[in-house]
Amino acid sequence: MSLLTEVETPIRNEWGCRCNGSSDPLTIAANIIGILHLTLWILDRLFFKCIYRRFKYGLKGGPSTEGVPKSMREEYRKEQQSAVDADDGHFVSIELE
């Protein structure tokens, strides 16, 4: 039997909960761990892009360009922009007569 479950028993034609040993330290610790786990999971799902980008790159906004000549940085930026511009032509306009 799990420590985290409550036992439902019929009482006077109604359903009630009977919690045995709710002051048990192990039960309290398990409840706290469960609540923390749920909270962290929700925060992870809400902010996963920000969190993992922060772990990957630290406090910087992106990958380091340290030691890369300025001309190469500019060329890379232009390539990235042209790739984005080229993707705009992916959609085809169809005109019906």
UniProtKB/Swiss-Prot annotation:
Gene Ontology biological process: protein complex oligomerization; symbiont genome entry into host cell via pore formation in plasma membrane; symbiont-mediated suppression of host autophagy
Bias-annotated ranges (Basic and acidic residues): 71-80
Extra remark beyond the main annotation: When the channel is activated, one or more imidazole moieties of His-37 probably become bi-protonated.
Domain of life: Viruses
Entry's Gene Ontology cellular component terms: host cell plasma membrane; membrane; virion membrane
Protein name from the UniProt record: Matrix protein 2
Subunit description: Homotetramer; composed of two disulfide-linked dimers held together by non-covalent interactions. May interact with matrix protein 1.
Annotated family: Belongs to the influenza viruses matrix protein M2 family.
Alphabetized UniProt keyword annotations: Disulfide bond, Glycoprotein, Host cell membrane, Host membrane, Host-virus interaction, Hydrogen ion transport, Inhibition of host autophagy by virus, Ion channel, Ion transport, Lipoprotein, Membrane, Palmitate, Phosphoprotein, Signal-anchor, Transmembrane, Transmembrane helix, Transport, Viral ion channel, Virion
InterPro entries (alphabetical): Flu_M2
Glycosylation sites (chain numbering): 20
Residues on Intravirion side: 44-97
Keyword Hydrolase belongs to the record: no
Modification Phosphoserine occurs at: 64, 82, 93
Lipid-bearing positions (S-palmitoyl cysteine): 50
UniProt site positions, description: Essential for channel activity, possibly by being protonated during channel activation, and by forming the channel gate and the selective filter: 37
Domain comment (free text): Cytoplasmic tail plays an important role in virion assembly and morphogenesis.
Xref: Pfam families: Flu_M2 (PF00599)
Membrane topology (UniProt): Single-pass type III membrane protein
Region feature (Disordered): 59-88
Regulation of this protein's activity per its record: The M2 protein from most influenza A strains is inhibited by amantadine and rimantadine, resulting in viral uncoating incapacity. Emergence of amantadine-resistant variants is usually rapid.
Claim: Chloroplast is one of the keywords in the record: no
